[in-house]
């Protein structure tokens, strides 16, 4: 089985050093910087049709802008109600200053 890595963004397109808007939206996924590392999740909340790229990132937690549920962006784990389902995460690597995502 071959690996399916896609070029998601330039590394410098994922904002650094701010408490909000750490995320970068690319179609159906969302990129985040946490402590210098890049993480990727689906861009749609598992609870409702809210875009995670419109949420608020604090540390490792992204808060859904619709119902304030929070996910750990590093693991995808749903951390509080009303969330009952984890969010999908994607493996990330940096190649030639490009953020690459491994899709299933």
From Swiss-Prot:
Cleavable signal peptide: none
Free-text cofactor note: Binds 1 [2Fe-2S] cluster per subunit.
UniProt keyword annotations, A-Z: 2Fe-2S, Aromatic hydrocarbons catabolism, Electron transport, Iron, Iron-sulfur, Metal-binding, Transport
Names of required cofactors: [2Fe-2S] cluster
Rieske domain boundaries: 5-101
Region (Disordered): 1-21
One record GO biological process: catabolic process
InterPro entries given in the database record: Rieske_2Fe-2S, Rieske_2Fe-2S_sf
SUPFAM superfamilies in alphabetical order: ISP domain
Keyword Electron transport: yes
Binding site for [2Fe-2S] cluster: 45, 47, 64, 67
Short name of one Pfam family: Rieske
PROSITE patterns assigned: RIESKE (PS51296)
PANTHER family named in the record: FERREDOXIN-RELATED, RIESKE DOMAIN-CONTAINING PROTEIN
Similarity comment: Belongs to the bacterial ring-hydroxylating dioxygenase ferredoxin component family.
Protein name in UniProt: 2,4-dinitrotoluene dioxygenase system, ferredoxin component
